[in-house]
Amino acid sequence: MNETRKFFNSYASDFDGIYGVKKYLLNYFINQLFRKSMKLRFEKAINYANPIQNKTVLDIGCGPGHYSIALAKMGAEEVLGLDFSDEMISLATKKAESQNLSHICKFMVKDIYDYYPTKKYNYSIMMGFMDYISEPRLLTDKIISLTKDKMFISFPRKNGILAFQRELRYRKRCPLYLYT
């Protein structure tokens, strides 16, 4: 896990750009070409979260807060984003503050395995998170115990050109787990 934490601390700003912040033209085109699935996953998860009004959300591996902030804007009562990357949480917190959503969106530097809430959440989200989990069953069991209504989880596919290029890019950066 330390390798993955280090990777995301160093990659936070670039990762944030995947969701549409146009820093450089080349990155924009790369994101459009190779990361369409991330945009589609985002849109589907947000749509499946309806109705969101008066719901509580736990966003595990929240990264820079894209899902959390979108759900808060749609009317979630409370959103808690967890990530073990200090840099990701810093980005998420700044975004929530800049959009006047910090009363709804809270963010914590926390590993989900070390999180023991006193309540259950209506929805739990783990998007782009299982890619870095070696024991998915342990994690899903924990999330089931924290969730009242719905869980949104993405599992990366093992086959295809996108999976192949990800395996090459991540090989020396951090562990990557793909599923069939």
Model-identified regions with their sequence ranges:
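Conserved beta-strand signature within the Rossmann-like core of class I S-adenosyl-L-methionine
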Residues: 148-156
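Short conserved loop adjoining the S-adenosyl-L-methionine
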Residues: 114-119
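Short, glycine-/aromatic-enriched active-site segment of Class I SAM-dependent methyltransferases
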Residues: 158-177
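Conserved class I S-adenosyl-L-methionine
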Residues: 1-49
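Class I SAM-dependent methyltransferase "Motif I" SAM/SAH-binding loop
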Residues: 61-63
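A short glycine-rich, Lys/Arg-flanked "PGG" loop and its adjoining helix->strand segment in the class I
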Residues: 137-149
